[in-house]
């Protein structure tokens, strides 16, 4: 299974921190967000990675090549990162993932490696890991029906109907 990591965004809400550094390379403690994600994925057996970059692409490429030189990493550049969102970045991966199982995640989330393990060992075809907390207007919200099937994933859906924020695994995109 391949890991698809979306890392194209500008993260303008974090300025001035992101004026010279992409959000995924910001450190929490001793390690940056992207390093934490890579370590968790490698710990769970991932050895193929697709990274969609945009803003400050070369910094991300340089970091990953320096820290993970033996990993199989495909870089895809979203040249429209200033005017598009994660859905477009994901769309750019289609020729690399067509019909294959993937684990999809944003590059700027902090998660326990055990979440990846639980996702991988699920008997479900398509699953999402959700963080249940009070949601703001900028979070991507998830709406489910009475049978717990996902019916909408969006920033614009009503917070009152959302059950959590997505940190996705989708088996076939």
Regions found by a protein language model. Give the residues of each.
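Short catalytic helix/loop segments, enriched in acidic residues and glycine
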Residues: 20-35
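A generic "binding-loop/recognition-motif" signal
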Residues: 10, 21, 56
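Conserved N-terminal catalytic core of the sugar/cofactor nucleotidyltransferase
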Residues: 2-5, 31-101
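Short beta-strand/turn micro-motifs composed of small residues
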Residues: 7, 53, 106, 130
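Short beta-strand-to-loop acidic/aromatic patch adjacent to the donor-nucleotide binding site
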Residues: 100-110
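N-terminal nucleotide-binding beta1-loop-alpha1 segment
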Residues: 1-18
């Amino acid at each position: 299974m391949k890991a698809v990591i979306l890392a194209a965004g500008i993260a303008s809400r974090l300025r001035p921190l992101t004026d010279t550094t992409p959000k995924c390379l910001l450190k929490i403690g001793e390690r940056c967000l992207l390093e934490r994600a890579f370590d968790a994925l490698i710990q769970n057996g991932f050895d193929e990675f697709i990274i969609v970059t945009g803003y400050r692409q070369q910094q991300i490429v340089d970091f990953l090549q320096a820290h993970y030189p033996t990993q199989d990493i495909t870089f895809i550049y979203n040249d429209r990162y200033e005017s598009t969102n994660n859905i477009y970045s994901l769309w750019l991966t289609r020729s690399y993932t067509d019909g294959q199982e993937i684990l999809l995640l944003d590059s700027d989330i902090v998660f326990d490696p055990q979440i990846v393990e639980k996702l991988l060992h699920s008997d479900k075809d398509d699953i999402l890991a959700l963080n249940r907390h009070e949601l703001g207007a900028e979070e991507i919200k998830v709406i489910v029906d009475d049978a717990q099937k996902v019916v909408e994933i969006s920033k614009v859906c009503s917070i009152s109907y959302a059950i959590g924020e997505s940190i996705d695994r989708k088996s076939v995109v």
